[in-house]
């Protein structure tokens, strides 16, 4: 588990180091302005896998940076239920939504179009999952 987290952190750092080379502009927001939501996949926040790790990381970061954080568990294991959880998070004021796992591929495509002002973070989702 620790190796997986370290790999994710390193991959993120590498991606950020390339941003200036490709003309990506930096956008800064005050952490206190962020209202972070996490939606679980078919598991819960005690699954000892992506949901739990993501929940713990989001909670710790939010506490350290003074951001509001909530998590949502879909009522069922379906794209519709995951979409409904994202809709609820946005209705509750979330402007950053974390969706851990490939099960969120369809949700990311649909919801990011519906909510262009919301930032979506999708650990363990690749372009191949979305296509």
Walk through the language-model features, giving the residues of each.
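Short, low-complexity disordered leader/linker segments with a strong preference
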Residues: 1-34
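A residue-level marker of the well-folded mature domains of exported/periplasmic proteins
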Residues: 27-131
């Amino acid at each position: 588990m620790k190796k997986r987290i370290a790999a994710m952190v390193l991959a993120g750092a590498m991606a950020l180091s390339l941003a200036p080379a490709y003309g990506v502009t930096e956008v800064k927001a005050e952490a206190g302005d962020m209202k972070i939501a996490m939606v679980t996949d078919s598991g819960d926040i005690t699954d000892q896998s992506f949901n739990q790790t993501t929940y713990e990381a989001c909670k710790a970061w939010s506490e350290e940076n003074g951001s509001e954080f909530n998590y949502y568990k879909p009522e069922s294991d379906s794209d519709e239920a995951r979409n409904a959880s994202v809709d609820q998070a946005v209705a509750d004021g979330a402007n950053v939504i974390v969706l851990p796992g490939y099960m969120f591929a369809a949700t990311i495509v649909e919801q990011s179009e519906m909510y262009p002002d919301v930032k979506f973070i999708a650990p363990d989702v690749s372009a191949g999952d979305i296509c």
